[in-house]
C-alpha cells in the first residue's frame, strides 16, 4: 500500500491505507443481524410474528463476497426463523443465533474454518459486538452504531445498518483484494 496515514479514494469516500491493508487479508466476514443487516427495528404482528427488512444491496454484496472466496457468517443475539430463511437465500451456511456471548461462536468459527483472527472482519452496531470486534483483524461499526463502539472500530461505514452498510464493507473487502470487478453482472 502507501505510507501510514495515507488514504485511498473509494466510491464511499477516503479509506485509510491501514484499513485497506487489513481488508486485503480478510477470509471471513462475520455479521450481526439487528442493526447491521437490518435497521434494528422489529415489527410485531398481532399474532406475535416478527418481521424485519433486509436490504437487497447488502444481499448482493454478501453473494459477491461468497463467490470471491470470502466466507460469510452470522452471529446474532436473537433467534428468528426469518434470519434462517434469509441466510439460506443468500447461501450463508454459518449461522449462530441466540448468542449472548458471541465469543463462543467466534471461537467455534475459527476452529471449524481453520482461520486466524487477523483474517476475520466483524461488523457490529452495539456493545454486545465489542468483545469479538477487539479480537479480529478488521473491526467495523455501522454509521449508526452505539456511540461507544464507533471510536473503537478500525472502520466506520458511511451508510447506516440495514441501509447498505454490509454492501459497503463487502465492496471494501473486494476492492482491497482486487476482486471488485469480478462482481459485475452477478445475480442473487
UniProtKB/Swiss-Prot annotation:
Organism: Escherichia coli O6:H1 (strain CFT073 / ATCC 700928 / UPEC)
Listed SUPFAM superfamilies: HAD-like (SSF56784)
InterPro entries documented for this protein: CMP-NeuNAc_synthase, HAD-like_sf, HAD_sf, KdsC_fam
EC number: 3.1.3.45
Record protein name field: 3-deoxy-D-manno-octulosonate 8-phosphate phosphatase KdsC
Top enzyme class: hydrolase
Cofactor dependency: Mg(2+)
Alphabetic keyword roster: Hydrolase, Lipopolysaccharide biosynthesis, Magnesium, Metal-binding
UniProt family annotation: Belongs to the KdsC family.
Binding site for substrate: 34, 55-59, 63, 78, 86, 102
Residue numbers binding Mg(2+): 32, 34, 125
GO-annotated molecular function: 3-deoxy-manno-octulosonate-8-phosphatase activity; metal ion binding; N-acylneuraminate cytidylyltransferase activity
Subunit architecture: Homotetramer.
Gene giving rise to this polypeptide: kdsC
One GO-annotated biological process of the protein: lipopolysaccharide biosynthetic process
PANTHER family: HAD SUPERFAMILY MEMBERS CMAS AND KDSC (PTHR21485), N-ACYLNEURAMINATE CYTIDYLYLTRANSFERASE-RELATED (PTHR21485:SF6)
Pathway: Carbohydrate biosynthesis; 3-deoxy-D-manno-octulosonate biosynthesis; 3-deoxy-D-manno-octulosonate from D-ribulose 5-phosphate: step 3/3; Bacterial outer membrane biogenesis; lipopolysaccharide biosynthesis
Keyword Hydrolase: yes
Physiological role: Catalyzes the hydrolysis of 3-deoxy-D-manno-octulosonate 8-phosphate (KDO 8-P) to 3-deoxy-D-manno-octulosonate (KDO) and inorganic phosphate.
Reaction catalysed by this enzyme: 3-deoxy-alpha-D-manno-2-octulosonate-8-phosphate + H2O = 3-deoxy-alpha-D-manno-oct-2-ulosonate + phosphate
UniProt KW Cell membrane keyword: no
Domain of life: Bacteria
Coiled coil: none
Signal peptide: none
